[in-house]
Amino acid sequence: SEMCIRDRFKIDYVGDEIAVEWTVNRAGGNNSMTDEMQQADESDIKTAGKSICTKISVDGTDRKETKNRLKLALYSMIEKGTGKSLPWGTLSGIRPTKIAMKCIEDGMNDKETYDYLKETYLASDEKIDLSIGIAKREKALLDKVDYDNGYSLYIGIPFCPSTCAYCSFTSYPLGVWKNRVDDYLDALEKEIDYTAQKFYHKKLNSIYIGGGTPTTLSPAQLDRLIRKIKCSFDLKDCLEFTVEAGRPDSITREKLLALKKNGISRISVNPQTMKQQTLDIIGRHHTVDDTIQSFKLARELGFDNINMDLIMGLPEETLDDVRHTMELVKELAPDNVTIHSLAVKRAARLTIFKDRYSDMQMVNTQEHMDLCAAYCKQMGLEPYYLYRQKGMAGNMENVGYAAKGKAGVYNILIMEEKQTIVACGAGASTKRVWPVPNPDGTHRIDRCENVKDVGQYITRIDEMIERKQRLFEEK
């Protein structure tokens, strides 16, 4: 039926607050939009006596396009009215490099890709350049991966020495579950057996043991788990085997030796910051020196691909604190550095007990990110993957930097969503990527998740396996 739409945005800017009212009046009750529909947006921003108006015209046959045009109009008006802009413009998704990658795969050159990202999302020049550069490096790395006949494996170890204030991942204090770790490994091995049998005809391209903190396991338990994986899967096509050692207070010589003798090619030693006061605030029960000594021990034992995670926007951290952290990291010369922007989720202690942290400053800016990028460049590291999350400090991003030949393949695969990832363990989420593309070039993705609670995972392991069976038996 005939329908006309009139969207009116009223935005009153008072002090530092913006109130938005968006009403849509539709005649005919039809939710679809008709061809050749003219839409007039009368948009008023009142700020210090000024009024800013805009009118746009769209072909309403494409709902997604119409939504994007409305977002652009609203964003542009708010930008004019407040004098403020966002580094990523209207982009709110977590994988901006997927857009740049799609442009490259469609044959666009750098200029055409830049113009598309600028015109479609109003992203800043810095973020567009970052996205294009990373997408090109990702494409070169992913050319080695067989999407259709390959897959990757994630193993979750949901235990930590303690829970960090910002963390919302599936993790539990080891002290509470110490007597059930072997039971957990029993259940995990059962899920590994199913996966190995189901995917025996596929190429295993990468393995990632994460958590939690995998090195909360004892040396014997680490050896047991990795030997189980090596005995269960054909690793001849495996490009990378990562164990996220993570917390320096969980790392010992014996554990590193267990990893080394089993051929682990990549590990993480994650300080998050090199400021001791911040470590104490966020509940990481280790010292700056623990990080330094753990890293040096790993180097001494021959690990030549070590990542270090850092977080921008932690409580009470200044730009000078970040500079101090990067100076110490530079002295260690890791092969990978991952710069995270603090993203506090509902389940994190920073949210649950927010009154305790309400007086603490948590700031991340483009200046912070640029400083980290400059230090990484000095270390010979280039950005190779990027992702975003809701509620990120400064509306920034997470960026992985790596030396030549040391980029994390699994990190790229999980962000680009081009290959199936089978995930085992409590709270692990399996992602099936269908090989036949949709008309728009994207791929259908289906998921199944394991229960998060360790006790439930142990007792319901058969059900977890059945979930995977249903996911992969669908034709």
Where are the language model's segments positioned?
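Short, small-residue-biased leader/transition segments that mark boundaries at the very start
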Residues: 2-5
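Amphipathic beta-strand/beta-sheet edge segments enriched in Tyr/Trp
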Residues: 7-60
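N-terminal [4Fe-4S]-dependent radical SAM core
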Residues: 82-85, 105-106, 110-153
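Canonical Radical SAM [4Fe-4S] cluster-binding loop centered on the CxxxCxxC motif
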Residues: 148-183
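Conserved non-cysteine loop/helix-boundary elements of the Radical SAM core domain that shape
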Residues: 171-372
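A C-terminal junction/extension of Radical SAM enzymes
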Residues: 347-424
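C-terminal accessory region of radical SAM enzymes
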Residues: 364-393, 422, 428-475
